[in-house]
Amino acid sequence: ERLIWDDESVFGPSPNWGDWRNGPGVDARVREVLEAAETLVRDRLAAYGRGAARYGLIHADMRLANLLIDGGDTRLIDFDDCGFGWFMYDFAAGISFMEEHPQVPALREAWLDGYRAVRPLDREDEVEIDSFIMLRRMALLAWTGSHAGTDLARSQAPHFAAGTARLAEAYLA
């Protein structure tokens, strides 16, 4: 059975990776900001909708760690998170754990250019990428709590909640 990657799978009663409120470093200030971001993400994605041009089968973990590059050929691996979600969510998954990196705007433009080479995007698709980045980041905050024993989660734990709050503040502005 394929996973679902939507607001319910991150914020609902049975989230895929646990409750973001249980992530390391989530204090009262972080919780307040992220609860406001959660509300806005839910509202914006409800308005965005799940039409066939926006929602379907996605990889959901298209990070650099899951690309094999051989000369001019690139292959995508690791389909365990593959499931149903918004197509634009794949960009957010692609920048997992590096959402605050200064190269993200350039990566975003390159990804959009590549996407447009295959199929058209409307303005709303591009605008809502920020909602998908916030959705994914909050899912990852939950993941750092539910996967606390992994090296990646341990390396992210000291700063991830505060960084997520910074992203949320920018998203809410």
Regions found by a protein language model. Give the residues of each.
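A cross-family kinase active-site recognition segment
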Residues: 1-32, 53-55
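ATP/Mg2+ or Mg2+-diphosphate-binding catalytic cores
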Residues: 21-25, 29, 140-173
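Mechanochemical coupling/switch segment within NTP-driven translocation systems
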Residues: 32-46
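Hydrophobic packing residues in well-ordered alpha-helices of helical domains and bundles
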Residues: 34, 38, 108, 157-164
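Active-site acidic catalytic loop and adjacent metal/ATP-binding pocket
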Residues: 42-89
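All-alpha amphipathic helical-bundle segments outside canonical DNA-binding/catalytic cores
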Residues: 121-133
